[in-house]
Amino acid sequence: MQDIIRKTRNRVWSRSYRAPHMYNDSTEEVASVFDEPTKSLIYSRFANPTVMAVEDKIAELEGGVGAMCTTSGQAATLLSILNICKAGDSFISTTEIYGGTVNLFSFTLKKLGIECIFVDANASDEEIDKAFQPNTKAVFGETIANPALTVLDISRFADIA
């Protein structure tokens, strides 16, 4: 994929690609995308040079090996939990989160067999510790929380975990 992006980057700034469809040299090249998705670009919903440039820059700035951009915070939240938890797992979330996320955690993930245990961010250390189960895989919180604008004490939760 880097070669594809590199072809578009011989300028001071990255070009913005607004077209949903990408040009390919042959139908064989297009067909190969479905066998090996990193080989070529076909349609911007799968990948496009603009998003890939942003992902590369974020990874570089953060010192990471990669990054993933999503079209919404809900998509990012869902993907983060699904990459850590599977059916039968649980995770802890503070109650001070966006209402749509409460719905995602309480209903959607429950249908997939993933349990969310909600705790108040201001609960005692003992109450938070008690929420952890043997199958707890993650802790989720927002900072600055929506809509309360509270700041989560991440280090406190990390110490308890």
Task: Give names to the regions the model predicted.
Residues 107-108, 112-123:
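A glycine-rich helix N-cap at a beta->alpha junction
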Residues 58, 76, 91, 139-142, ...:
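Buried hydrophobic positions in well-ordered alpha/beta secondary-structure cores of metabolic enzymes
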Residues 145-161:
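Active-site core of PLP-dependent enzymes with the aminotransferase class I/II
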Residues 86, 132-139:
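Short acidic/histidine-rich motifs immediately flanking catalytic phosphotransfer sites
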Residues 1-38:
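N-terminal glycine-rich, Lys/His-bearing helix-loop that initiates the first secondary-structure elements
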Residues 83-101, 120:
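Conserved PLP-anchoring active-site segment centered on the Schiff-base-forming lysine
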Residues 25-78, 100-109:
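Conserved N-terminal alpha-helix of the aminotransferase class I/II PLP-enzyme fold
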Residues 98-99, 125, 144-149:
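Short, small-residue-enriched loops and turns at beta-alpha junctions
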